UniProtKB/Swiss-Prot annotation:
HAMAP family per record: Pyridoxal_decarbox
Pfam families assigned to the protein according to its UniProt record, in alphabetical order: Pyridoxal_deC
Record-given protein name: Histidine decarboxylase
Gene3D superfamilies on file: Type I PLP-dependent aspartate aminotransferase-like (Major domain) (3.40.640.10)
UniProt gene name: hdc
EC code(s) of this entry: 4.1.1.22
Subunit architecture: Homotetramer.
Sequence similarity: Belongs to the group II decarboxylase family.
InterPro entries per record: Group_II_Decarboxylase (IPR051151), Hist_deCOase_bac (IPR023523), PyrdxlP-dep_de-COase (IPR002129), PyrdxlP-dep_Trfase (IPR015424), PyrdxlP-dep_Trfase_major (IPR015421), Pyridoxal-P_BS (IPR021115)
Enzyme class: lyase
Organism of this sequence: Pseudomonas entomophila (strain L48)
Top-level lineage group: Bacteria
UniProt keyword annotations, A-Z: Decarboxylase, Lyase, Pyridoxal phosphate
Binding site for substrate: H120
Catalytic activity: L-histidine + H(+) = histamine + CO2
Length: 403
């Protein structure tokens, strides 16, 4: 590959930008703490996982063996036997959500999909693309679905086969819809378990709840029919990706035999990235369950540290149990822009993913939020200046490298 000097300079400039901002992210669920150096050599190959990783295909350069290991890992993590499940490495959380909703629609073609107003924006696209009837359900103040409103809407619709989109960690507030409560309420109104579908969007929390002592219900043992998790959020990846797992009996309904690839196609996309399954495989193989627990505990401790600091300054900050999403009142647009914070209405959040291995970035943000909240007292007490500077840059510790 030959580039002009101007094009090369443009790449070099972007390289410096990436180096400077590698660990900037505190407002979005993305973990920059990874090192896939041992996989760099495979970038010279066009690796394509078209089709089903469980069957031999006609395209030789695939990473099916690695993808199978990844799916075996997540089947166990989400409490379903591998032989009773099927899933794949997706392009991200939206594809995983679409896959789950697609299975639900094929199982209940006339069913209505119910989702809370705190649900990820991808659901609005999905229901349009799949042409599923849908109903938005009110949210409780803490971000969970309003269970009374859910049941009222199901009753008003006289829906016999509801499709419930369950949030296992909402985007803005990290709320987890109570799967046990939903099932209990449906049972109370006489809807049998086999007559409805539960899809769980666990984009961030899917790699948190399996590694805490007292997780909220979220997996197949707790009653879900499908679940998806992102690969670039808690695990970390240079390429956005995700994992979706579903019950095999439901997946078989959408399987199509494609003669020219000599494989059954069960996925949303045709050609699929063959590099991301290898990255997920490397990340999972290089961290023991104890190491994942330590990573999760570190992130949870950092989140609680942020809550404590903000509350000590009189700022109404909070988080859910087992959540690394810290919710607080929306600061000025200057602070939100500087720290790339996600805001919605009068609410903002910070997210303590594993690349925050010390508290420098968290402290820098909180210092400014406190200064804005109580400027005179805070500045007098700490004598701070230069708050308009760039947040401190950091280097990730090597003991968290994936490879």
């Amino acid at each position: 590959m030959t580039l002009s000097s101007a094009d090369q300079a443009r790449l070099d400039q972007f390289w410096e930008h990436c180096l400077k901002n590698q660990y900037f992210n505190i407002g979005y669920p993305e973990n920059a703490d990874f090192n896939y150096a041992q996989l760099h050599r495979f970038l010279r190959f066009s690796i394509n996982n078209c089709g089903d990783w469980a069957e031999p295909g006609n395209y030789l350069l695939n990473s099916f063996d690695f993808e199978k290991d990844v799916m075996a890992y997540f089947a166990e993590l989400f409490s379903i036997p591998l032989e009773e499940s099927w899933g794949y490495v997706t392009n991200g959380g939206t594809e995983g959500n679409m896959f789950g909703c697609y299975l639900a629609r094929e199982l209940f073609p006339t069913g209505t999909l119910y989702y809370s107003k705190d649900t990820h924006y991808s659901v609005a696209k999905i229901v349009k693309l799949l042409r599923i009837d849908c109903r938005a359900v009110e949210s409780l103040p803490n971000g969970e679905i309003d269970y009374d409103d859910l049941m009222a809407k199901i009753a008003a619709d006289q829906e016999q086969h509801p499709i419930i989109f369950v949030n296992v960690g909402t985007t803005m507030r990290g709320a987890i819809d109570n799967i046990a409560t939903i099932q209990q309420r449906l049972e109370e109104v006489g809807i049998p378990r086999e007559d409805y579908y539960l899809h769980a969007d666990a984009a961030l929390s899917g790699m948190i709840l399996p590694f805490v002592d007292n997780p909220q219900p979220f997996n197949f043992a707790d009653g879900v029919d499908s679940i998806c998790v992102s690969g670039h959020k808690m695990i970390g990846s240079p390429i956005p990706c995700g994992i979706v797992v579903a019950k095999r009996e439901n997946v078989e309904r959408i399987s199509v035999d494609v003669d020219y690839i000599r494989a059954n196609d069960k996925t949303i996309s045709g050609s699929r990235n063959g590099h991301t399954p290898m990255m997920m495989w490397a990340a999972l193989r290089s961290h023991s369950p104890a190491q994942w627990r330590r990573r999760v505990r570190h992130s949870l401790n950092s989140a609680q540290y942020a809550v404590d600091r903000l509350q000590a300054a009189g700022i109404d900050a909070w988080r859910h149990d087992n959540s690394i999403t810290v919710v607080f009142p929306c600061p000025s647009s200057r602070i939100a822009r500087k720290y790339c914070l996600a805001t919605s209405g009068d609410t903002a959040h910070l997210i303590t993913t594993p690349h925050h291995q010390d508290k420098s970035m968290i402290d820098a943000l909180i210092d400014e939020v406190i200064a804005e909240h109580q400027p005179n007292e805070w500045r007098a007490g700490l004598g701070l200046a230069g708050l308009d500077g760039v947040p401190p840059e950091r280097v990730a510790a090597s003991h968290f490298d994936v490879i």
